[in-house]
């Protein structure tokens, strides 16, 4: 994630949402020789038009694009930093409002939109607000989550401002929220202390699988360019996450400091990424964090803790005037609830 000024943000608004999960994978024969089916990844501009109409009272620009199936015919799309204000002929109105942190869009089966934020259109602010201490501004950027029996379980990462420029912010902690799906009101929240104990930014990919919930996060070096993935596992007790344990490379441990990186991921994984189950496999999709950030890769595993293998380059971002307009690309998102299964390798 990164905070950007308005000019940068306007240039890199989500023009496309990549529904990559529909065209990701190839099949493998039993002899371990790949039987490759060439599949073309297509850009999908329809969702941008549906989720971010240029006119109206909703979000017309933003990053994040993290989606969660609300299990009632609606889908939640969570944006990080975002814009409110009309866009006409690809130009943003002068009275557009910039919101730091998070805003939500809910789309129903009819394609109707509901936008969730605090304040009003003249002075909008983040939907889930971070408590302030009067020192430096603090905010939540959205992580990932899931729905179970009418409750949205949601992870949010708290940051604070520590300097100027696009990277003048600092990670503070991971908080776990529960919201009522019908009203989208917060029921309660709980801090995840493991994130501060072992340095893993938990909650940026979450996967319900069999009888457990797997909570993934990256741990980066001091430069932020190199990062590995760690995973925690929890149970639902009275529809609330409890009994957290952490993968140490061989078994699950109650001590969060025993965590170890997941094996087999050859690229530096982006701050936000995707993990989901598909055809009895576990799939991880990530944008390249360092090197060529335009590249989007997938990996597969037989279990949620890996090891992962079968690295595959899915797509390379090819946006017109990318360098000329000083665009940035990061944190690709997959939307498995819209998946049309083809093959997996």
Locations of the language-model features?
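Active-site cradle of extracellular carbohydrate-active enzymes
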Residues: 203, 207-302, 316
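Beta-propeller blade signature
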Residues: 92-109, 168-182, 228-236, 297-303
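Long, hydrophobic, well-ordered secondary-structure blocks that form the structural core
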Residues: 144-235
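C-terminal motif of bacterial Sec signal peptides marking the signal peptidase cleavage site
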Residues: 26-27
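Conserved blade-ending motifs and adjacent loop-strand segments that build the rim/top face
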Residues: 309-337
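N-terminal regions that are enriched for targeting/export leaders
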Residues: 34-141, 157
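Conserved small/polar residues in nucleotide/adenosyl-binding loops
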Residues: 342-344
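Structural signature of eukaryotic scaffold interfaces centered on beta-propeller domains
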Residues: 63-70, 135-148, 200-211, 269-278, ...
């Amino acid at each position: 994630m990164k905070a950007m000024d308005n000019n940068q943000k306007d240039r890199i608004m989500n023009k496309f949402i990549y529904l990559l999960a529909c065209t990701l994978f190839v099949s493998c024969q039993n002899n371990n020789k790949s039987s490759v089916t060439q599949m073309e990844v297509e850009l999908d501009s329809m969702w941008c038009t549906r989720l971010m109409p240029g006119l109206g009272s909703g979000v017309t620009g933003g990053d994040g694009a993290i989606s969660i199936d609300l299990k009632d015919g609606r889908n939640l799309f969570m944006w990080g930093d975002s814009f409110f204000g009309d866009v006409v002929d690809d130009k943003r109105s002068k009275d557009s409002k910039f919101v730091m942190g998070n805003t939500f869009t809910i789309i129903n089966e009819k394609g109707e939109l509901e936008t969730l934020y605090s304040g009003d259109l003249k002075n909008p602010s983040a939907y889930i607000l971070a408590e302030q201490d009067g020192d430096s501004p603090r905010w939540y950027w959205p992580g990932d989550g899931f729905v179970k029996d009418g409750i949205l379980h949601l992870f949010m990462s708290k940051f604070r401002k520590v300097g100027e420029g696009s990277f003048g912010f600092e990670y503070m902690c991971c908080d776990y929220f529960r919201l009522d799906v019908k009203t989208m009101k917060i029921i309660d929240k709980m801090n995840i202390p493991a994130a501060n104990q072992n340095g893993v930014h938990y909650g940026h990919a979450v996967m319900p699988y069999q009888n457990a919930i797997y909570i993934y996060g990256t741990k980066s070096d001091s430069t932020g360019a190199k990062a590995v993935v760690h995973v925690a596992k929890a149970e639902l007790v009275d529809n609330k996450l409890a009994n957290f344990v952490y993968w140490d490379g061989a078994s699950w441990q109650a001590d969060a400091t025993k965590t170890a990186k997941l094996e087999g991921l050859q690229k530096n994984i982006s701050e936000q990424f995707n993990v989901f189950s598909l055809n009895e496999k576990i799939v991880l999709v990530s944008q390249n964090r360092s090197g060529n950030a335009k590249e989007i890769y997938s990996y597969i595993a037989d279990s949620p803790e890996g090891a992962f293998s079968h690295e595959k380059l899915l797509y390379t971002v090819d946006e017109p005037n990318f360098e000329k307009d000083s665009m940035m690309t990061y944190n690709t998102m997959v939307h498995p609830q819209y998946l049309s299964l083809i093959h997996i390798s």
